[in-house]
Amino acid sequence: MNASTKKGKGLGEYMPLAFAAGIGSMLGSGIIVGLSATIVVWQEGLGLDTTQVGLLSGILTFAIAFGSLFGGRLADKIGRVLFYAIGAAICVFAPNFTVLLIGLIIAGLASGADLPVSMTIVSHDAPDEATAAQLVSTTQVFWQVGVFISFICAFLVSAMQGATGGRVVFAILAVFAVIAWLWRLLSPTFRRFHEAADVRDAARPAVVGNGKVSVTKV
């Protein structure tokens, strides 16, 4: 009973890690669903043809995939979530297809870069493998949250004229991204978790001789 209680408390203490990483998943699904749910609005508001509509969806998907492989270093220069916010903000003010496409590419790269890095940070900063596994599984809920929020926002703005509805949806995504960036940047909790994990990592090789930790697990 005591072990179970301590485990629950430990998981609860580290839940901010899951929330911070989950926001990355939420923003990723949010931009995919946000675009698909408002693509007709963008098409009518900006006068896009069917080829341009197809390019927007296809290139966004490619940008997310490319970002997950190569976008980490690029986005880390200014912060992955802030990079996402910049891309979403460009979409908000896009006057034509080209600018909208640029915004989607930037946001897609940042979204793709954030997902694997966030999972790695959760695994690194969690106190043990069991807690890390639970935290990572918890972040998956946020993907569905992003889908839900985007659909609701798209429905609420569907009656707006021109591309205004699409701009509002992307503005909401940009605001979420800025809030997430500030939270990750300024919260002392995440700094404390990361420093504690670094201390644990530094201590592990020292106890290998006692048979407590294997170097292969470091």
Question: Where on the chain are the PLM-derived regions?
Answer:
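Transmembrane-helix signature of 12-pass secondary carriers
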Residues: 1-218
